[in-house]
Curated annotation (Swiss-Prot):
One annotated GO biological process: lipopolysaccharide core region biosynthetic process
Catalytic function, reaction form: a lipid A disaccharide + ATP = a lipid IVA + ADP + H(+)
Domain of life of the native organism: Bacteria
Biological pathway: Glycolipid biosynthesis; lipid IV(A) biosynthesis; lipid IV(A) from (3R)-3-hydroxytetradecanoyl-[acyl-carrier-protein] and UDP-N-acetyl-alpha-D-glucosamine: step 6/6
Name recorded for this polypeptide: Tetraacyldisaccharide 4'-kinase
Residues the record lists as binding ATP: 54-61
Originating species: Rickettsia rickettsii (strain Sheila Smith)
GO molecular function, one term: ATP binding
One Pfam entry name: LpxK
Keyword line: ATP-binding, Kinase, Lipid A biosynthesis, Lipid biosynthesis, Lipid metabolism, Nucleotide-binding, Transferase
E.C. designation(s): 2.7.1.130
Encoding gene per record: lpxK
Length: 321
């Protein structure tokens, strides 16, 4: 898997974006071809699909965690399906406590704390496992652009700062698909990390299905210490902003590619950087789960989703799903 950082031209067009545009047109054509040839299957339970239109972190995992807690509180049985990014997974697997991030993906390890999780890279492979578990609801994390299965309820997650970047498809821009079609079809749209009352113009036609959401810390961290932050996630800037808003003194930071698999040498380098800054290492939960076997002493910031219209979410989820 090719892992890229989020380049500046994905947010603001420059000559590089325009030079890559012909490749984006090929990407668009292949996407249309794939969708036109696909014969979507019906999965053996109602499907809630959580996805986004662009590359990079938009808060999907936190939305899935929120949904899992919501369904559990209603005694609704569910299974989470995750895409196993950054793993060496060969076939669909039901995650158990002993699985590592390298085996099933960092998101799978985290989500397994909230309920039954199937990690897969091929959506069709989950059917036998779903039949064994017999859930009422299947929460699919990502796969929004996958045309090979029917979706009963879709949630599109949008980062309030990046929105849809420069408006170009991969690789000239961050888009997996142009947003209008996805937003029109969505049952709900989450505008994540939004602390502003003003709705971005591109989202004003969808105000009736728009939910403002914030990523907020859910654990206590000593604010008297110095911290050196690092992450290998899709939107590291939001993580660093969350740390500062939480009141931590961040003396430095280092960014790794999304879903990065850390080596012992990386850990040693990070400890060296922290020592230079007279600081303690702090990272995300997605990164922290990858260090289980490396005997580390790294602080982890846990986060959760806070939304402004929980009643709207409850009404739509339980009315349709």
């Amino acid at each position: 898997m090719i892992k890229l950082l989020y380049p500046e031209f994905w947010q603001k067009r420059n000559i590089i974006a325009y030079l890559l545009l012909p490749i984006s047109l090929i990407y668009q054509f292949l996407g249309y071809l794939r969708a036109s040839l696909a014969r979507p299957i019906m999965l053996p339970a109602k499907v809630i699909c959580v996805g986004n239109c662009s590359v990079g972190g938009t808060g999907k995992t936190q939305i899935v965690m929120y949904l899992a807690k919501l369904l559990k509180a209603r005694n609704v049985s569910f299974v989470i399906v995750t895409k196993a990014y950054g793993s060496n997974l060969k076939s669909a697997t039901t995650i158990h406590q002993g699985h590592t991030a390298l085996e099933v993906g960092d998101e799978g390890v985290i989500l397994a704390k909230y309920g039954a999780v199937i990690a897969t890279k091929n959506i069709k492979e989950i059917v036998p496992l779903i039949n064994e578990l017999k859930p009422d609801i299947i929460i699919v994390d990502d796969f929004l652009q996958n045309p090979y299965f029917h979706k009963d309820f879709t949630i599109v997650s949008v980062d309030s700062q990046r929105l849809f970047g420069n408006g170009f498809l991969i690789p000239a821009g961050p888009l997996r698909q142009y947003p209008n079609k996805a937003l029109d079809a969505a049952d709900l749209i989450f505008l994540v990390s939004s602390h502003q009352d003003k709705i971005p113009q591109i989202l004003t036609p969808y105000v009736n299905k728009l939910i403002n959401a914030q990523i907020v810390p859910s654990n206590n961290i000593d604010k008297t210490k110095n911290y050196f932050a690092f992450s290998g996630i899709g939107n590291p800037e939001r993580f660093f902003a969350t740390l500062k808003n939480y009141g931590l003194n961040i003396t430095g930071y280092k960014i790794f590619p999304d879903h990065y698999n850390y080596l012992q040498a990386d850990l040693e380098n990070l400890y060296s950087l922290a020592k230079e800054h007279n600081a303690i290492l702090v990272t995300t939960r997605k990164d922290h789960v990858k260090f289980n076997d490396l005997n580390n002493n790294i602080v982890c910031l846990d986060v959760e989703l806070s939304i402004n219209h929980p009643d709207l979410l409850n009404e739509k989820i339980f009315k349709k799903a």
